[in-house]
C-alpha cells in the first residue's frame, strides 16, 4: 500500500515492519467486518483511519474490503454510507473517496516522526526496537553475542512495537497475541546474559512497555526541538517506585539525565518505568500539578495499610499484587502442560485448586489495599478459563469451606486445603493439609470396617492426627473422637 516515495524513504527492515503492520490491520478489519455483519464499528473506523494516516491508498483499502468480503460496488457503498449516517466516522472523505487519494510522505508528519523515533531508538539499525537483551550471552572479552533464537524473539517484539505505536491496535490485544505466538513456538522463558530468566509473559510485558515509552520519548524530544524548548514535565503515576520521586515535576534535558536517570536501566524510561516526559514552554505552559498537590499525592503513596500482620505502602502493595499475578500465570501454564501431558485427574484438579487459592488471595489482598484487580495481566496468556474446576470436583462442607474431590489420599497436598475420598463401600475420608502441604489430620465418617479399632461416635466416625519426626517421617496418631467443632464442620457427611 505504500507509494514509491514512501518506500524509498524507508530502510528495508522498517519497510518490512510497516508492510506487515498494514497486512495485520487489514486482516483485523476484515475479521471485525465479518463478525459484525459487515458493519463498520467505531473500532473498525479507527483502524481504517489510522491505516490511511500511515499512507494507505483509499482505493486500495476499498478494493481489499470488497475482495475479502466478496461485495458488489453497491453493497460496499451501502456499508460506507452507514458509517457516515451514524456520525462517528473520523474522516468522512475516506468513505466518500473524496480529497487526496493518499497522504504524500513529505506531508505525512506523523509517519515521518514515527520513523525518526524508531531510527533514534535503534541507532539507525531499525531492528530490536525494544532494545531487548534476551538470549544474549556474554563472551569472555565482555561483549554480548545474541543466540540464533534472539532474532526470532526480537522480530516478534518489533511487530508488537509497530502495532502499538501506530495506534491501530490496543496494548492488551497486541500483548496477548505476542505471548501466544511465542509460547506456541515452544518458548517458555527468556534468558539474559546476567543469568536472570523470566517467563515469556513477564519478559514481553516489560520489553513492550519499556520500548514503547522510549519510542514515545523520542517523539517528545522531536516535539521539544520544534518548540525550541529544553524543559520537560515528567508524568506522575500512582504506585511508582520510591526512587522515582521526581514524577510530576519540570526538568531541563540535562536534569532528566542527572536527576531522573534518563538512559539508565533503573531511571526514567528504563526497565518497567511507566513515566514519560513531554516538552513544556516556561512562561507559557502550566504545570499539571501544583507543589501542594504533589505533596498530598506523595503522602497518600506512603500511607501504610495493614494486611495479615504486615504493612504495605502503595508501591509495596502493587509489587505483591504483581507477584500474585505472576504466580497465577505460572499456575495456568502448569495446568495447560498437565492437560497436554494427559496427567492423572487428581494432579490436574490439584493444580487448578492451587490457582484458585492464589486467585482468592489476589481478590482479598487487592480489596484490602484498595487496588483495582488487573485480571487482564493474568488472562493475557489466552488460556481463558483454564483454571475452572468442574462442579462435580469441588463441594462445600457444613461451614462453607471448599472440599476437593480426589481419587486417593496422599500425605502431600495443596497447602491449607481439604480433600475428600469416597472408598469402595461409600465411606468418606476428609484429609486436612497445613501451610507446608503436609497432611495433619483425617476425619472419617465410618469405622473402615474395623469397629474394634474405631469404637467412636454413632457410626464409627473418628479422627486421626498426623505428626512427623525431625526427618519428616510420619507418626500417625491413634483414632480419637471428633470434637464438637469438627462435628459441626463436617455435619454434611456425618
Segments the model singles out, each with a brief description of its role:
Residues 266-280, 460, 478-483:
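Short beta-strand-alpha-helix junction that forms the catalytic/metal-binding core
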Residues 1-268, 282-412, 416-436, 441-450:
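Domain-core detector
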Residues 463-494:
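Active-site or metal-binding loop neighborhoods of secreted/extracellular toxin and effector enzymes
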